Amino acid sequence: DGSSNAIPGHSLPLATLGVFILWLGWFGFNPGSTMAAVPSIAHIAMTTNMAAAVGAIAAMVTSWVMFKKSDISMALNGALAGLVAITAPCAFVSAVSSFWIGLVAGVLVVLSVLFFDKVLGIDDPVGAISVHGICGTWGTLSLGLFAQDVFSPGTTYSCSSGGVMSRTPPTSDATKGTPLAIASSKTCGN
């Protein structure tokens, strides 16, 4: 009849174990991507953990508010959503920013699972489109919104470090005339 039928999880303990194994593995993925034993590894691990934990809590609270009951599978997807969202900006954002990135990812994953299921009628039993597509996009955008120079001096054009609105655009001969230099010079008023 065209309606989607939810398939209940067969083993929430195994699903939870799987998410915790992924969560642990993400500590090799995000901090391990620095390819060197540098002090920023601890910061990257902290932002990764913060976003995942807040994503799980945000998804749990959102599902509780919307469905009048907690949904463990949504909380697990919230943790994964936080991990996916923090992957791009993990080295460039503060702990407070990672909190907000995880919070938005946790809420987004619940809303987008419902959107794909109810509105579009797309059969996505584990919420992979929502976790990886929607929250991955959010994480990429959040890099531009929350990156701070203190974590990587001279490399960011983000809103929280003044952004393109207060930054002098690139002026080296290599960047003159490029779309970025032209756009940022117009945005910055130079």
Label for each model-derived stretch:
Residues 1-169, 181-184, 188-190:
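Glycine- and aromatic-enriched membrane alpha-helices
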Residues 170-175:
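Low-complexity, glycine/proline/serine-enriched flexible coil segments
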